[in-house]
């Protein structure tokens, strides 16, 4: 079992070391608790099936309940989906970063484990 590590980041712009440590944990298959615009969430690398399964296990979440993939900027979207409708671009430009989730056709790069077995991905 992995040891719990507390990293307090009050302002990401002023705590590069903490942000890099959290990123390192994610890159190595670990889980990180993060605040989002609406709730606190348990984050994992969306490309890492074992890490995603660890989120399902930690939360007692059914594996057919898709994860939401969070991205830092709109430029990351094309790697995650096979199509970006014009209205999705307009919404993303207007509301991201912010509490807007869009469901789009998933790229084959996103494991089905992350999408709960669906051919779409929530971003």
Regions found by a protein language model. Give the residues of each.
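Active-site-adjacent structural elements in enzyme catalytic cores
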Residues: 1-123
């Amino acid at each position: 079992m992995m040891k719990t590590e507390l990293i307090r980041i009050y302002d990401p712009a002023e705590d590069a070391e903490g942000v890099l440590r959290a990123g390192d944990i994610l890159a190595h298959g670990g889980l990180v608790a993060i605040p989002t615009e609406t709730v606190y969430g348990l984050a994992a690398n969306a490309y890492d099936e074992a890490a995603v399964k660890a989120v399902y296990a930690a939360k007692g979440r059914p594996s057919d309940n898709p994860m939401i993939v969070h991205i830092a900027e709109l430029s990351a979207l094309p790697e995650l989906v096979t199509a970006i409708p014009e209205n999705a671009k307009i919404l993303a430009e207007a509301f991201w970063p912010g509490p807007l989730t869009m469901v789009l056709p998933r790229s084959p790069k996103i494991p089905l484990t992350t999408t709960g077995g669906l051919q779409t991905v929530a971003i």
